[in-house]
Amino acid sequence: MKLFGFGSRRGQTAQGSIDHVYTGSGYRIRDSELQKIHRAAVKGDAAEVERCLARRSGDLDALDKQHRTALHLACASGHVQVVTLLVNRKCQIDVCDKENRTPLIQAVHCQEEACAVILLEHGANPNLKDIYGNTALHYAVYSESTSLAEKLLSHGAHIEALDKDNNTPLLFAIICKKEKMVEFLLKRKASSHAVDRLRRSALMLAVYYDSPGIVNILLKQNIDVFAQDMCGRDAEDYAISHHLTKIQQQILEHKKKILKKEKSDVGSSDESAVSIFHELRVDSLPASDDKDLNVATKQCVPEKVSEPLPGSSHEKGNRIVNGQGEGPPAKHPSLKPSTEVEDPAVKGAVQRKNVQTLRAEQALPVASEEEQERHERSEKKQPQVKEGNNTNKSEKIQLSENICDSTSSAAAGRLTQQRKIGKTYPQQFPKKLKEEHDRCTLKQENEEKTNVNMLYKKNREELERKEKQYKKEVEAKQLEPTVQSLEMKSKTARNTPNRDFHNHEEMKGLMDENCILKADIAILRQEICTMKNDNLEKENKYLKDIKIVKETNAALEKYIKLNEEMITETAFRYQQELNYLKAENTRLNAELLKEKESKKRLEADIESYQSRLAAAISKHSESVKTERNLKLALERTRDVSVQVEMSSAISKVKDENEFLTEQLSETQIKFNALKDKFRKTRDSLRKKSLALETVQNDLSQTQQQTQEMKEMYQNAEAKVNNSTGKWNCVEERICHLQRENAWLVQQLDDVHQKEDHKEIVTNIQRGFIESGKKDLVLEEKSKKLMNECDHLKESLFQYEREKTEGVVSIKEDKYFQTSRKTI
């Protein structure tokens, strides 16, 4: 996975890919991936973490499914207490997670300064890199935390650490437009001469990402403004290609200051060099006033500076000027001051601009006003001027041919240059996208070749035509002084009429010559006008053709850029997937090795455990047998005792019932006898009715008592019936429990035959114990029922006694009443 690239203008896509890695508030937590100690670390529960470590000390460096320790999660969440606890327990402080990030990198990434300081104080290594090649200092730069960066540097962080794109923290701060961090790193002596993988300096990156403030800071640090990247472009070329006039002006002013400082060594030649330098830079910007041959030169030279020709510009200038070997550069008037500069830096700059002056000369009209004035003033040196102009024109044609040849050769050799440097534009993966980019640029290369060849032919024809026109104009200009001189002679001859006849004949000849020359001049002027009109029409036609070619080139460039962006995205995605698969493969291999080792260890443990288990099983079977026998004996004794008790209780109840029935029969006999006596005494009672009226009240009371006693008797009988029903239920329950006990004993026997089912044995034992408890509960209930039955028997017996006593008292009352009546 790449952090950033430079595939788009001023770093739009670069910033987006940076945010993909650097933004975010920590880990994505899933509860299924965590252990207990990891959950406690995420929550910040130091007490729970300590309890986990007390239970299992091996959990101190335990990894979750994402290869994160508790220290990683605590640092990402900012729980200082948990971090101090883990560090004091001597945990691994530089352990890496799935993305190869240490807890220190994660703390800096999440801007948890307190956790980062604790880790640094306990010896965390600040120079370890993650899978993106970033150190903790890179993350501190992105978050623009100067305090964190200060702590990292004070604990030995390397200020020139490189990521995967060879970016130091300073270059990374420039890419992210972190002006505050740039100032901080420069104060901490970070190297301003560092370059990235494309050999771009800090100033070039600041220009590319449109950061005037950072450019100003770097210029104050006296950075090398003449440094070039792999394509031979300097910082000013970047500013021109992106139309950043403000930054270009800053760089030009800085270059002027450099040239002024060299003034004491260079002398007066510096002023001319600076003026040439400034004028040529201004002319290199796109202007709307360029006409005439400017169209031809614009078609010969590529429009964008962002596609430089192979090699540096001053070397090309030397090759162009000295390539033909027909004349030195001193013949050209605009190149004379630049040859006098002695300072190497200024000399290199001026040499780079000499080529631009030669190109700019082609854009100017061939016959300028200065040249015309120069020709008018130099009447005596006309042949020399003519020869010089001819040599200059031939030199210009040769130079234009060389420029067009160089552009065509540059277009032809651009693919080879791209293969050397790995890209046309700075991109994220130059080596991996080489083949894809070659395919994309091959079509563009062929189109550029054809366009350049056609434009070269047109420009050559245009130059030849302009050369003929120029020669005619020069001849006309050369004839004009002779005509003027002849006119002066004719005027002088007119003013001196007293001269000889020979002078008059000379004047007449001169007048004839003057007329002929005037006629020739008029003809030449007409031809010049017609040629100018033709040239204007052709120029308009060429301008239209150039616009069409520009539009097609722009469309092709957009298409190429889109293809390049798609290729970079696919390559980025494939690289990301490949890195993820590699990391996953290494992780799985490590887990496989661990599992193999643990499997071997477990097999050895299983063998030892099997021997122990066999001995334990034999002991357990013996103990279970004895326990079972004891329980069976106990249950039998319990059953026998319960049966004996129940039988004795039932016999007692039966005896009591028989006794009560006998008593009832006796009372019935007595009652019948009393009835007979009552019949006998009824007649006497009729006689003694008066006496009975007094006794009736007492009798009614006794009757009420007897009714109450009857109700009590009925209730007692109902209770006896209930007790008998309950007794039957208890007997059924006892039978059911006996059946359950028998079933449990059978299950226990079956389970003991299967020694591996320990849990079933324990469950059966528990059921056995519960059944014993139920038996005890039932015994208690039976005892309660027996007590209730005894109580009912007593109440019944008491009722019978009271009943008999009531009957006897009634008889006695009746007897006393009868006796009273008789008396």
Curated annotation (Swiss-Prot):
Comp. bias (Basic and acidic residues): 372-384
InterPro entries attached to this UniProt entry: Ankyrin_repeat_domain, Ankyrin_rpt, Ankyrin_rpt-contain_sf, CC144C-like_CC_dom
Keywords from the named record: ANK repeat, Coiled coil, Repeat
SUPFAM superfamilies linked to this entry: Ankyrin repeat (SSF48403)
SMART domains in UniProt: ANK
Coiled-coil spans in chain: 431-480, 571-724, 776-805
PANTHER family, sorted: ANKYRIN REPEAT DOMAIN 36-RELATED, ANKYRIN REPEAT DOMAIN-CONTAINING PROTEIN 20A1-RELATED
Protein's name according to its UniProt entry: Putative ankyrin repeat domain-containing protein 20A3
Gene: ANKRD20A3P
